[in-house]
């Protein structure tokens, strides 16, 4: 959801956005997490490996479109079969189906981990995704739903960047009251 919001802000503010990979599988590999969460991590790692690998092999410009193609199928689409999700995402982007092999390859794990740890090093280990960095200001979040548009997208952006730029600002949170809204 945050990526949709950042897209909206980038379009209205002419931001130069560099998309990176933050892997929940890497983040949680040595942590005690619930069995349900642990069961998802191998599939999550496959997606992260695919995106990181194609960022290396095809180029960084594929990261965001691939992230969107995968994410749209997984989240609002509810698809759970990684093989189908990956094949459909590659087809949507006009990429060779053989590139799916990278989902199961550790060939570019160094790039995946470097991207992951670049983000985590900016905000700390006790966060998740998304991580947003604006110049020297970085933060976890926001966790939002639905993604704001128009002036509200800009208002939220300005407020969050302003709050996060205060050196002593660490956390602002409230409980979620709804499931993600993709429309």
Predicted segment positions?
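Structural alpha/beta surface segment adjacent to cysteine/selenocysteine redox centers
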Residues: 1-86, 160-163, 171, 180-183
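C-terminal cap of thioredoxin/glutaredoxin-like
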Residues: 6-10, 83-183
């Amino acid at each position: 959801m945050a990526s949709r919001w950042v897209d909206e802000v980038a379009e209205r503010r002419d931001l130069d956005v560099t998309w990176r990979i933050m892997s929940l599988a890497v983040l949680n590999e040595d942590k005690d997490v619930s069995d349900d969460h642990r069961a998802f991590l191998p599939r999550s790692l496959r997606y992260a490996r695919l995106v990181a690998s194609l960022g290396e092999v095809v180029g960084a410009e594929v990261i965001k479109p691939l992230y969107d193609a995968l994410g749209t199928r997984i989240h609002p689409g509810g698809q759970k079969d990684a093989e189908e999700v990956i094949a459909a995402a590659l087809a949507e982007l006009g990429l060779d189906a053989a590139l799916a092999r990278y989902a199961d390859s550790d060939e570019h794990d160094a790039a995946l981990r470097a991207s992951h740890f670049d983000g985590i090093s900016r905000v700390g280990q006790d966060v998740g995704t998304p991580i947003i960095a604006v110049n020297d200001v970085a933060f976890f979040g926001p966790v939002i739903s639905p993604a704001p548009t128009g002036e509200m997208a800009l208002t939220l952006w300005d407020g969050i960047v302003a709050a996060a730029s205060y050196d002593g600002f660490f956390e602002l949170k409230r409980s979620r009251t709804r499931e993600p809204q993709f429309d």
